[in-house]
Amino acid sequence: MPTYLEINRHDLREADYVRTPTAELAPGQVRFRVDRFGLTANNITYGVMGDAMRYWDFFPALDGARGRLPVWGFGTVVESRHHDVPVGQRAYGYWPLGSELTIDAGRLDGRSVVDVAEHRAQLPSPYNRYIFTEHDPAYRVGFEDIQILLWPLFYTSFVVEDFLDDHAYFAARSTVISSASSKTAIGAAFLAQRRGTGPVVGVTSASNLAFTKGLGCYDIVTTYDAIESLDRDASCYIDIAGNRDVTQRIHHHFGDQLTYSMIVGDTHWDAAAELQLPNVGPKPEFLFAPVQIAKRTKDWGRDGLEERVGESWRLFGDFAQQWLTSDVRTGASAIREGYFDVCDGRIAPSVGVVCESLT
């Protein structure tokens, strides 16, 4: 029977397994076994923003008060009633935190299949696409865990940095990034440093300071306690932390020297959410990645965009292998424990939780 970790939508620290009957496939449907997936702070953000951004709508739970958290990873077709999707086909994509997923297979293009189920029709299309491993430009043998843990985060990093480059970094001479030890921040810093538009400044906790400095993708690294010691040069700010207190202090410190303020994530999802947005400097703007992706698809074409992302991804993957290790959790009990470890911030930034064999 399929097994899912269902989470209280209003208390992410409450999560238990449910088992559901196996439904017979209808014509055109495909059943995937979820083989291996990652758990990162990004998944916790999906839960925090689940109602506002409709993340809970991808894989509805039977109980509307609970949700099935989306995760990224690899799955294998174990049953198919679609003649173009054979049993044994492997794909990378967006799964529920569970043992399997049944999709309504459609829009096959030789490289991927899309879940065209009615409940996903109005949700962002990139999340509905399952890319066959043999045709996946992001896939490399020996880099599966890197892809599981970093690919969706890196795509966000690419869009963040590309958006800034598309606007000439808003005339900033330096780039300040909060939650600098987070994987999305590291990707953005790696790309910004390669762009060479000026110093890349990372802000992190004291406990992650040594790790973040050791990465080499930041020119300057400081702690949250030392924000006010940063040079007040013309700067743009990438808010990965989602901590309103940090944003307030960045804005008040840089004042009119802050040329742009971008909100990306919520790695500090449980901190100071009730504080008001700053009234000093530019109004923070939320990055809606699909808009920039659509713009670049128009500018470069789909193949041109994928080529640029792919080239950057290969470089970043080689870089990530130097500092990222996998903490593999096997079986239901270990996976649930891994979820709580990520939720409560007990995973070192140099480690990624990879889950397998949830049956």
Q: Where do the PLM segments sit?
A:
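Adenosine-nucleotide cofactor-binding segment
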Residues: 193-247
